[in-house]
Amino acid sequence: MKNKKILIISLCAVLIALGAAGSVMLKKNSISKHSLIYADVNDNLISYKISEKAKTRIFFDGYSEYLLVGKYIGGEYCCVSKGENSLYYDVLLIKNGNIEKTYQLSFCPDEIAATDGDIYCLTNGKIYRLSTADNTESLYKDNVYTHKYRLNMLITDKGDLVYLRQENDGSVSLVLDCDGQETDVFTFNPDDTIAVGLNTDNRFLYKDKSGNYKTMAVSVYGGKQQKYGKSATFVQASSDGKLAVKCKRQVLGECSDVYIVDGKTGIAVSTNLVDLDIPYSVVVV
């Protein structure tokens, strides 16, 4: 009987150990398949493989300058580029490592995000919508708050637009736009609140002076505000929601300290990524 108990205890210990090892392996695998895509200060398009801490340049035929990247619902990412000897800018929609479609722009935006139907371009406090049906540009929003943040226009994983709207009284509203139907999520004083970004389940993160600048979260689709993980000044989530990039500090739009965290729990899984010069426009694929 005693030997039987010892055998059962030993078997349980083995199963627990195997489960822990499997958990570690799963986390390692989920990290290894992700890369950061960004345009560096020399207008090169860079892929940074997280597990290997290695940078490689990405090239597409006919393009020599890569100026900006953004989220693309339906693919991996979108990129603003300039063709060789061209006076215009092109938006490249990238899927499975290749150019899926291209659209022409008359200007280079400050921020960009794309869905299957529309491409949103933010510049000088205005959002222009570029139709993927006929490649026409049209003014969509003209009251976007851009004085303090680099995260003024975001896209949820459902393809809906989220942006910061300037109000007449000086306050700023976080607005959800679903096919032209606007919903105010919440309004804040820009002198007291720091916008952070969208996390992996469509919660908008922010820090408020009244809460000692702890990171808070509110769902853009409705829900209670709540505390969220460790402090950060930027969040960019991967498309599958497993990882997020957080930059602890931002200086002139560039991240001076970058680390990778689990997108669901906020637990750091890779820190102190060296030799990175990542602008605010970074996409996790």
What are these regions (language model features)?
Residues N42-Y48, N85-L92, G125-R129, D169-V175, ...:
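Structural motif
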Residues T193-I194, D201-N202, Y206-V261:
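Intrinsically disordered, low-complexity segments enriched in Gly and acidic/Ser/Thr residues
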Residues M1-L15:
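N-terminal Sec-pathway targeting helices
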Residues Y63-I73, S106-D116, T146-D157, P190-T200, ...:
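Repeated scaffold domains used in trafficking and secretory/extracellular systems
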Residues S30-D40, I73-K82, G117-T123, G159-R165, ...:
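Short beta-strand elements that form the blades of beta-propeller/WD-repeat-like
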Residues G22-D61:
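An edge-strand/N-cap motif at the start of beta-rich repeat modules
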Residues A54-F60, N98-Q104, T136-Y145, Q181-T187, ...:
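A short beta-strand motif characteristic of beta-propeller blades
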Residues S35, N44, L93-E100, A114-I119, ...:
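Flexible "stalk/tail and boundary" regions
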